């Protein structure tokens, strides 16, 4: 039995430095088609993909993101929850469909659809020899992103993805993930605090050693310290407001 896909995904790491070589239209089309083949809840296909190669648009999005590789890449994708087409169907429907696509469940369906599509594209791109990095930073200013991309109601930007050939001096590596026994619960969830704390303590040590070796001692923080810093930072607290402005999560 071939383990090609297993070995490919196990090597995944974010690439943040790319060669100045744009993806061809053929490659972009193949990536999007691979994304479209992902599973979709109830065949709703509640997503769209916006492909961006316009340098001005990239620069505008970089201002939102604050990350140079939003501009410096082979191609930029933005993944959106998309119920605009469903809204158009609703205009001629005998039932009130907005109760569904404006619901919290509708939001979850769209976000999951977009994520599944994006992961298909990521794996396909890596199989082609490209590197990728996801860009949640586009949510730093959702209103501005909606303006830049001319998004109508019922469409919400979830994240972006930069794709391209890794630069010759790109030296990223796969980070150690949480232990198998910590994320895989057999038959039911195991919430024993002592076990959870012990597993996280071991993982903290693993991550601290990883950073220490990767940076020649310049970084030694643990995973728990990273989580405390990230979740303690009161950022993007306007998501509910922005979702509702888009016509989503009305109930």
UniProtKB/Swiss-Prot annotation:
It is an enzyme of class 1 (oxidoreductase). GO terms for molecular function: oxidoreductase activity. CDD domains: NfsA-like. Pfam families: Nitroreductase. Keywords: Flavoprotein, FMN, NADP, Oxidoreductase. The keyword Oxidoreductase applies. Its EC number is 1.6.-.-. Its cofactor is FMN. Belongs to the flavin oxidoreductase frp family. Reduces FMN, organic nitro compounds and disulfide DTNB. Involved in maintenance of the cellular redox state and the disulfide stress response. NCBIfam families: PRK10765.1 (NF008033). This is NADPH-dependent oxidoreductase. It comes from Staphylococcus aureus (strain MSSA476). The lineage of its organism: Bacteria, Bacillati, Bacillota, Bacilli, Bacillales.
